[in-house]
Amino acid sequence: MASELELKYGCNPNQKPSRIYMKDGSELPVKVLSGKPGYINFLDALNSWQLVRELKEATGLPAAASFKHVSPAGAAVGLPLSDVDRKIYFVDDEGELSPIACAYIRARGADRMSSYGDWAALSDVCDERTALYIKHEVSDGIIAPGYTPEALAILSAKKGGKYNVVQIDPDYVCPATETKDVFGITFEQGHNFFRIDRDLLADVVTANKDIPESAQIDMIVSLITLKYTQSNSVCCVKDGQAIGVGAGQQSRVHCTRLAGNKADTWYLRQHPKVLGLKFVDGIRRANRDNAIDVYISDEHDDVLAEGEWQKWFAVKPEVLTREEKAAWIATQTGVTLGSDAFFPFGDNVERAHKSGVTYIAEPGGSIRDDNVIETADKYGMAMAFTHMRLFHH
C-alpha cells in the first residue's frame, strides 16, 4: 500500500492539486484495486467503512451502507429478505443470498432514488452474489476488507473497468486526535471513539418500558447510522434496516419530516398497487425507480398521462389515491426512530407517530423533555434517553 494517492481534483474540478496521504509517512490503510476514486469518493468510503465496521461490532451481523455526499442514504444488517423485499429491491432470481448480500440490498433499498450513483460499503468480504447485484446498479464505487476472486472480476469489469474498488485493512485504527483545515486554520479534536451498544438504551423514560430485542437492534442501527450522517439528522429503522434518513437539516423537525417522508415512501413501495405494476420490457432499474417514485407521489399524472404512461408501463396503472396512500401508511407500525440530538418540542414525536414510529432513541436534555415524554406517552411509545449527542460534520 502507498503512503500517498494523487487524486484528479478535490470537491470540484477547479480545486487542484488533490491527494490523500498519511501525515507520518506510513502506508495508507487503503488500496485501490480498480478505477481511480476521487476526493468525495474517499470521503464516502472512509465514513461508510467506519459505519459498517461499528454496526457489525455492535450487532454481530454483517453490515452494509449506501453513501452519497458523505451521508448514508441507507444502512442495514444482513437479515434475510422476504419475498416482498426481493420484489421491491429487484432481486430477479430465487437463488440463496449471503448475509452480506442481503445487507447491501437492504441498505441500497432504503432510498433507491438517493442511492443512485452511491458508494457502497461492506463490513465483510464482498462475495460473488453481492457483486452481481451491484453490477446491475448505478454506483460509483465500493469499499470492503476484501473481495473473492469472482467478485473482484465482476466489479473490475463494471463501467468498462472504471468502477472504483477499494480494499481497506480491517485492523487499521486511526490516531486518537484528528485535524481539519478550514480557510487556512487548523481544527483539532479527539476522534469519536464512543461505543454505541445496548447499555446506551438503559434509561427508558416513558411509561411503556418494553423495548424488545428486535427494536434494540433497530435503535443501534439508527444511532450508528446517525453517528456518520451530516447533522442535524434523524433516522427511521425497521427490521435492521434504515428506511428513512433525514440528513443535514438546520431544523430538527425538518429532519424528522424528511426521515418520515422517506420511510413513508419506502413503505408505499410495498402497496399492492405498486407491487402489481406492469413495466415495459427492458426497462432499466433506475427508470423503474423513477416511475415508482412519481407514481406514488402527488405528481402521478407525470407518468400516467396519455402518451406518458406507455413509456413506462405495459398496462396503464390505476391511480394510487391520497386516501389509499394515507390508509396504507396508517398500517405501518414498529418503526424505530433515532435522533442525533434532543427533541426541543413534542412536534417531532407527533410527526414520527404518523410514520408508524413505536420506539425512539434520543439524547434528551431539552428544557421541554417533559413535553416530549408526554407526547410519546400519548401514543404508547417506548423512548430511551441516550444522554449522548452524535453530531457529525
Regions found by a protein language model. Give the residues of each.
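Gly-rich Lys/Arg/Thr-decorated short loops/hinges at beta-loop-alpha junctions or inter-strand turns
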Residues: D24-K36, A110-Y116, G190-K209, A286-E308, ...
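C-terminal binding/interaction regions
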Residues: D118, L122-S123, H136-V166, D171-V173, ...
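Glycine-rich phosphate/pyrophosphate-binding loops
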Residues: P62-A63, K68-A73, V77-L79, S233, ...
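Flexible, glycine/charged-enriched surface loops at secondary-structure junctions
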Residues: A58-S66, V165-I168, S231-K238, L268-F279, ...
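Active-site loops and adjacent core secondary-structure elements that bind or stabilize anionic groups
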Residues: M1-D197, A215-S233
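Glycine- and Gly-Pro-enriched alpha-helical subdomains that act as flexible
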Residues: A73-M113, I243-F342
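Active-site-proximal loop/turn and secondary-structure-junction residues that shape catalytic pockets
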Residues: S71, C126, D239-Q241, F343, ...
